[in-house]
Amino acid sequence: MNIQQIRNATLKITYAGRTFLVDPWLAGKGETGTFRSLGGVFRCKDGTWDIPMPMCDLPFPREDILKGVDACICTHVHPDHIDISPDGTIGAALDSTLPLFVQSMEDAHAFVRSGFRDVTVMYENSRFDDILLVRVPARHGTKIPCGPACGVILHHPDEPVLYLAGDTIWYDAVAQTLRRWRPGVIVLNACAAFLLDEGRLIMDDADVEKVVRACDGAAVIVSHMDNVAHATISRADMKKRLAERGLETRVIMPDDGQILTFPADR
């Protein structure tokens, strides 16, 4: 298994011989806009309203990122996970014939309206070739959820179980997913993004520690860093915080463009 950190929550994953692009937010630096330009739907802290997102450019040309992709996984339709055009269509940079896996019929309809032809809602037994794709729960906010989101389990007999936690905080369902699936590799979105009404939207260092303590030796990867205005933890902050918690050797935090490789017996 190879996992390449692209940017924010966008990952390029080669698993059991197939390549998935996860949460393909492929806009150039600043092209998505600011919280103010997005219409004030979300209330954020002072000082973050006018920061253009994404805050960093892609590490490679878009066409290189898309090269060799067999299917896409979109955990939820938010503007930092999939490109949303002014007319409301989504995923403009993607080949509309690519197989696409989503969390719900609502998200599937959004992709179909945008011209995609092969959209599958993930359930307990969804498959891409012989790879099992299972939607698992996520809670996208400590106060109230910032819309629906999901995690995804990838399972194949020749690979470690991979758990993409998605946009979630630590809560009982995450612990249950860890107990049920015993993943060998876990990806956590963990910049502690914060909105006034919804609270903290995804994991912070304390949540990362809870996962590490619960996962019995799995490789833990921190993603979704350094690209959204409402983040409250940067990569540099997270590195310090993990060291203070004694987790600097237990957690991997890849740079944009970096590839991580995990053996089948992980």
Whereabouts are the PLM-identified features?
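Metal-dependent catalytic neighborhoods of phosphoester/phosphodiester hydrolases
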Residues: D83-A92, E106-D107, H230-M238
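Active-site environment of divalent metal-dependent phosphoester hydrolases
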Residues: A27-K29, V77-I82, D107-A110, S126-D129, ...
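Pre-active-site segment of Zn-dependent metallo-hydrolases
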Residues: R18-I73, I84-T89, K143, W170-R180
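Active-site neighborhood of phospho(di)ester-bond hydrolases with catalytic His/Asp-centered motifs
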Residues: L21-D23, I51-P54, G68-D80, F101-S104, ...
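Cap/insert and terminal regions of metallo-dependent hydrolase folds
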Residues: T48, P99-V102, I169-D256
